[in-house]
């Protein structure tokens, strides 16, 4: 399959009944699947992991895999292979995940446990320097004075990949909605590389493989610059990206103009999906061929949104960047 192959209908294994969860295509795209844990599965999972507070998962990293096994066992061991199959499938690579009954900020710790279990069935979440943990929770409010667009509510946060300014491989990104008050707008934005109509033009450009400098602002707690190209290929030679407009530092006029044109071509793509993510749900995407961002919010003095993210590497395949590790 080449980079521009049309979506193959995987039929979401439409005839298959899963134990402990359901799986359907999303309303936005057949590439994005919706996975919902049943009320019984959710209840049993939370009961079985109740002995471990979130702090235990922070201090003892092996417990993150333990809670993952508990969740997979409750799903008759069908969950882990389904997650891996979906995320490693170039035609899909994205899930919107929900657990029935987990939908209130009072259940924030339960949300962290659930997301941790899912993430550690596919790999391991990296250390997040911004929070000092394997996950980060942060709040978006009506007024923001931070040093990046992460928390700024009244503008679009442009499409990007995570992990651009760190040396660790970032195969997946998980983004969970923990709380939302007085919110209008702010949908998640997603773009699959193969749905980007300008991919071939920019992937074939001479600057596509030139190593460029990426530097993070102070809030990220990362002081070392990293160098890598915007584009690379996976094991099958298909395009993957490692790009964010805020942190790439062009060294000259040629790079600056090309990056500016690249940004415009991404932001105006007709392939962008707008995905609402209610409280308690989370997106889990393949970071190599999905870009993500956020639409703007409608201003409100008491606007509040709390998010949780995890990002890490796949432990069951080597679909990494091939030429610049």
UniProtKB/Swiss-Prot annotation:
How is the cofactor bound, as the UniProt entry phrases it? Binds 1 Fe(2+) ion per subunit.
Q: Where does Fe cation bind?
A: 160, 162, 292
Cofactor(s) recorded for this entry are:
Fe(2+)
Enzyme class comes to oxidoreductase
UniProt entry keywords in alphabetical sequence: Dioxygenase, Iron, Metal-binding, Oxidoreductase
Enzyme Commission designation:
1.14.11.64
- Single GO molecular-function term? ferrous iron binding
Look up keyword Oxidoreductase and say if it applies.
Answer: yes
- Say yes or no: keyword Nuclease present: no
Q: Give the record's GO biological process terms.
A: L-lysine catabolic process
Reactions this protein catalyses: glutarate + 2-oxoglutarate + O2 = (S)-2-hydroxyglutarate + succinate + CO2
Pathway involvement of the protein, from the record: Amino-acid degradation
Assembly with partners or alone: Homotetramer.
State the similarity comment. Answer: Belongs to the glutarate hydroxylase family.
Instruction: Give the matching HAMAP family.
Output: glutarate_hydroxylase (MF_01083)
What biological function has been recorded for the protein in this entry?
A: Acts as an alpha-ketoglutarate-dependent dioxygenase catalyzing hydroxylation of glutarate (GA) to L-2-hydroxyglutarate (L2HG). Functions in a L-lysine degradation pathway that proceeds via cadaverine, glutarate and L-2-hydroxyglutarate.
Name recorded for this polypeptide: Glutarate 2-hydroxylase
